[in-house]
Design a protein with these regions (language model features):
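Conserved catalytic-loop aspartate of Hanks-type protein kinases
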Residues: 29
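Terminal C-lobe "cap" of eukaryotic-type protein kinase domains
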Residues: 144, 159-164, 170-184
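Conserved activation segment of eukaryotic-like protein kinases, specifically the C-terminal portion
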Residues: 3-18
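C-terminal lobe substrate-recognition/regulatory segment of protein kinase catalytic domains
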Residues: 66-153
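Intrinsically disordered, low-complexity regulatory tails and linkers that flank structured modules
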Residues: 179-231
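End-of-activation segment of Hanks-type protein kinase domains
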Residues: 17-22, 40
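Activation segment
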Residues: 6, 21-26, 47
């Protein structure tokens, strides 16, 4: 039997499923790898959270909300999100405002400091100044092509949904690793275990600014068989 710990991974590299208190697998290591790869490129952590709440906020601000099934099944979801259920039983999740979280936890959370221009991962990577040796047009074109491949690569590692996050076997075949040209967004040939069907709560909605998100799957035995959660 696997024991799932509530404190695992250094905060800057902690995966969404761990933050939300969900069962986890080796997919958490691929999230950490994505964080480290981007940090090596930027020179600073991509998600330098000052607390678990701030960590969740930074991830959501950059990558969007976790899938519905993660929010509905996460043991820690109510720590970070408010949930509203309408008359039709549809749920809407919103990040708790900084003031509310601070009041509930008797802490003084501070707004996130912004270290990079841009708000999305592609913007942040593309806006990093080019080096002096990239002054020639051909060098600049090559550098931007490398960045495009890098963005595609780390996007597969930093997929919030652990079912869709790339495995090591998938990631090592990416053109950024193999050196082949990237002509279109890359799709791995081998997938993780089949994604489970949508839950019965498929009519629920998840929102950051009021926009609904599609329903997601539920955890199943292939992902975390008979996992007791301690802590």
């Amino acid at each position: 039997q696997q024991t799932v710990y509530t404190y695992i991974q250094s905060r800057f590299y902690r995966s969404p499923e761990v933050l939300l208190g969900l069962p986890y697998s080796s997919a958490i290591d691929m999230w950490s790898l994505g964080c480290i790869a981007v940090e090596l490129f930027l020179g600073l952590p991509i998600f330098p959270g000052t607390s678990e709440y701030n960590q969740v906020c930074r991830i959501v601000d950059m990558l969007g909300l976790p899938p519905q099934f993660m929010l509905e099944q996460g043991r820690q979801t109510n720590e970070f999100f408010n949930v509203h259920t309408d008359a039709y039983g549809r749920r809407t999740y919103r990040l708790k405002p900084l003031e509310q979280y601070s009041h509930e936890h008797h802490v003084q959370e501070q707004p996130s400091k912004q270290y990079f221009p841009g708000s999305t991962l592609p913007e942040i990577i593309r806006l990093v100044p080019l080096s002096r040796r990239s002054g020639r047009a051909a060098d600049m074109e090559k550098e931007m092509a490398n960045r495009t491949a890098f963005i595609d690569f780390v996007s597969g590692l930093l997929n919030i949904n652990p079912y869709e996050r790339w495995t090591p076997q998938q990631a090592k075949m990416h053109p950024f690793i193999t050196g082949e040209p990237l002509t279109r967004p890359w799709q791995p040939t081998a997938a993780r275990p089949a994604t489970p069907p949508p839950s019965a709560a498929s009519s629920h909605t998840v929102a950051l600014q009021g926009a609904p998100m599609p329903a997601g799957p539920t955890y199943r035995d292939e992902y975390a068989p008979s996992v007791p959660v301690h802590g």
